[in-house]
Each structure stands twice: as C-alpha cells, then as structure tokens.
Amino acid sequence: MFKIEKIFFWKNAHTFHQCTVHIVFVPKYRRRVLQGKVATRIRELFFECCELNSWFIHEMEVMPDHVHLLLQFPPDVSIAKAAMFLKGGSSRKLRQEFPELEEFLWGDSFWQDGYFVETVGRMNQSVMRNYIKNQKIERTMTSHGL
C-alpha cells in the first residue's frame, strides 16, 4: 500500500488502484436506533469486517438513523458484495446482541433494503472526508434552526 497525500494506492500482482466509495446505510423504517451501545457496536462490526477482508475505512460517521462510510477496497470486490458483507454480518450480530431492537424493527433484517453509493475520486476525497466528519455538526445546527 502506498500513501500519497492521504490517498491510499494499493498494488496487487497486476494492478495499481484506488477504489473508494461513499456509501450510506439506513436502518429499516429509518428508525433512530443507531445510538449509544448500538452505535458503538456498529462501528466495531464495520471495522472488524473491513479488517477481515483487507478493506480500509477512511472515514465513518454513525448518525441515529443512518451510517456514512468512506470505504476503499480492491477492484475485484464489487460494491454490492462489500455492502452485502457489511450489512449482512452486522444485521445478524446486532439482532443477537440487542434483542430489544425487535420492538422497533420487525421482520428478519436490521437494515433497509438497498443503499446509497457514489464513487469518490482522489481529487474530491478530502471534500468527502470533511462532509462525513461534519455530519453531526451540520445535523445539530439544522435541528436548532441555525
């Protein structure tokens, strides 16, 4: 892995790459359940999944009703596969560890179907990092009418 101006380029046998996406996951019914211990645990689960798969989280912000990730992975991993691993593994674990969530999230899944994703080139990666970092600040200002 090479680091150039806070941008990571990975080298495999036949590729030199930097595949980064901004991805947003939302709990089912957009319930505000990503708070306290659940928010802490979701961060841990996402970092564990990425470490296990040799992916890299540049930035993450857990809001009460959604999660922003700036995620980098190799080109042989599809966005759909990365989303499936992150959402599937965390959903199962969260439902096991926090059975009280069943009151808010009926059915067998924690996450809403689908996700938002956009690719992030190296020219606008720092802009996206700041956007994700400042989610809580912007949300607080908006909710207070500022």
Predicted regions located by residue number:
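Basic nucleic-acid-binding interfaces
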Residues: 1-146
